[in-house]
Amino acid sequence: MARGINKVILVGNLGNDPDIKYTQGGMTITTISLATTSVRKDKDGNTQERTEWHRVKFFGKLGEIAGEYLRKGSQCYIEGSIRYDKFTGQDGQERYVTEIVADEMQMLGGRSDGGGMGGGGERPQRQTSQRQDYAPRRQTRQPSQSPQSSPPPMDDFADDDIPF
């Protein structure tokens, strides 16, 4: 018997540049604020927009990719799970936080949209994560090093092979 499903799918735009941190073990944790907007008509027939802001966290390799390619204004597709945490603030008050822990991410839009990939006939790349639980919240950044990163792998077929 299934224990339950915790699945979130979001498509939205980044409200700020990614915040990148590292655990003591060197794992990357990238946090973004993602805005989603829904549109509906009110009882008078007027269009109403509602924007929701979501805190999204990426871990490990997916965190590295998100930190490198996403920028404020970028549009992206995210799959993950929702998590609710409770902690005590420095003032002694209990605080609650809701986060989306991303398992997959796909950059949408072209380079002019700040998407970092796509455009120019390229297909946006879908990235998945081998998620691990992370260390305590307060982490320090590792000494600044320029990690050599390779671009995400391309598919085995040409764009001409796609039937649309």
UniProtKB/Swiss-Prot annotation:
NCBIfam families: PRK08763.1, ssb. This is Single-stranded DNA-binding protein. InterPro entries: NA-bd_OB-fold, Primosome_PriB/ssb, ssDNA-bd. One of its GO terms (molecular function) is single-stranded DNA binding. One of its GO terms (cellular component) is nucleoid. Pfam families: SSB. A motif (Important for interaction with partner proteins) lies at residues 159-164. Signal peptide: none annotated. Residues 108-164 are annotated as: Disordered. Keywords: DNA damage, DNA recombination, DNA repair, DNA replication, DNA-binding. Plays an important role in DNA replication, recombination and repair. Binds to ssDNA and to an array of partner proteins to recruit them to their sites of action during DNA metabolism. The keyword Lipid biosynthesis does not apply. The keyword DNA repair applies. Residues 5-109 form the SSB domain.
